[in-house]
Amino acid sequence: MITPPKNPALGFTLLEILVALIIFGLMSVISFRGLSSVAQSRAHLAQENRKWSEVALLFARLEQDLSMLANRPVRDAANLNAAPLVAKSILQSESDTQLSFTRMGLPDQGNVLAAPTRCGYRLQGERVEQLIWPATDAAPRTIPTVNLLMENVAAVEFTYLDSTGTWHSRWPLPDSDMVFPAAVQMVLDLKSGERITRLFALPALQ
């Protein structure tokens, strides 16, 4: 009769090894999914931060431009007199804008104001653009500088408040002596589904 050794050699059975491999594989999958979820969350957060930063910068740019309104009539590309602030809902040319106005020049390094310029805003495709003309009186072939302010925008709507508290989609108003509206409202519809409304009170320059 053979007596088994008192201290048998220690080791893992094949079944134990397979169970350990399965557990290790499951833990690896869970860890990978967790890291992937964290990476996706970070990317989404960065995209959201960038989107809202662009919205804030767009509103800040328009607010700055509107705060520098100048009551100076201009001549348009057709050599016709145009009001200091012009608003339309339908664009008719490549350089046309939904909102355009005369803006005081910015100060240079010597704190001397530059000459007034013509400034405009529009939605072109899915892009909100600012247009700057080199002179207030536009020659027929004057090409404005186009600055991209924001992308992925579904719609932009401007409305204008008169002295009676009525909102209008165009400016100037027929049979009215109001040069500027009391306020401008901008409604921004983003491709991601949000709608943002911002009201800009205008300086009293009538």
Regions from the PLM with identified roles:
Residues 65-75, 148-149, 198-205:
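Juxtamembrane/interfacial segments around transmembrane helices
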Residues 30-136:
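Extracytoplasmic beta-strand-rich oligomerization domains located immediately C-terminal to a leader/signal peptide
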Residues 1-2, 7-35:
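N-terminal single-pass transmembrane signal-anchor helix
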Residues 94, 122-127, 148-157, 191:
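A short, structured loop/turn motif at beta-sheet edges
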Residues 109-113, 140-142, 169-170:
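Short histidine-centered beta-strand/loop micro-motifs
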Residues 114-118, 143-144, 181, 197:
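Short, surface-exposed coil-to-beta transition loops
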Residues 135-148:
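Short aromatic-glycine motifs in intrinsically disordered, low-complexity regions
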Residues 152-206:
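Short linear sequence signals and composition-biased patches located at protein termini or domain-edge surfaces
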